[in-house]
């Protein structure tokens, strides 16, 4: 199975800041990479697929990049609704494994 290594595990940032989350695949997955946001008690919501394609309705402050084994999700000008957990997932071959997640919290 393809292993997905996500970092950091935890991120504390302020509204208005820019953050970047990274994901590394254990082998080449080309651009078959998705990013999800999950709020506590809710199902994950797809943000990005094919490494860089934003789902309709997702704000343009989100951007995905990368290919092969190295990927990133950048969030510009963080908004209060952006805080939660983020996961990468490859969709190259079954099983579609997830990264371990990044918890993004408001810096106090």
From Swiss-Prot:
SUPFAM superfamilies with a match to the protein in the record: Immunoglobulin
Keywords: Adaptive immunity, Disulfide bond, Immunity, Immunoglobulin
Gene Ontology process terms (BP): adaptive immune response; immune response
Disulfide bonds: 23-88
Region (Framework-4): 98-108
Region spans: Framework-3: 57-88
Region (Framework-1): 1-23
Complementarity-determining-1, as annotated region: 24-34
Name of one Pfam family that matches: V-set
Cellular component terms (Gene Ontology): immunoglobulin complex
Xref: SMART domains: IG (SM00409), IGv (SM00406)
CDD domains recorded: IgV_L_kappa
Region annotation (Complementarity-determining-3) ranges: 89-97
Domain of life (superkingdom): Eukaryota
Start and end residues of each stretch annotated as Complementarity-determining-2: 50-56
Chain spans, region Framework-2: 35-49
Miscellaneous comment text of the record: This chain was isolated from a myeloma protein.
Name assigned to this protein: Ig kappa chain V-V region MOPC 149
């Amino acid at each position: 199975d393809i292993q997905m290594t996500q970092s950091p595990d935890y991120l504390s940032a302020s509204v208005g800041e820019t953050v970047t989350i990274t994901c590394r695949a254990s082998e080449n997955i080309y651009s078959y990479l998705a990013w999800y946001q999950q709020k506590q008690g809710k199902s994950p919501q797809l943000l990005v697929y094919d490494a860089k394609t934003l789902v309709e309705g997702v704000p343009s402050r989100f951007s995905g990049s990368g290919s092969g084994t190295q990927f990133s999700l950048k969030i510009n000008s963080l908004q209060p609704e952006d805080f939660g957990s983020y996961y990468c997932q490859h969709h190259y071959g079954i099983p579609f494994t997830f990264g371990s997640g990044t918890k993004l919290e408001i810096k106090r």
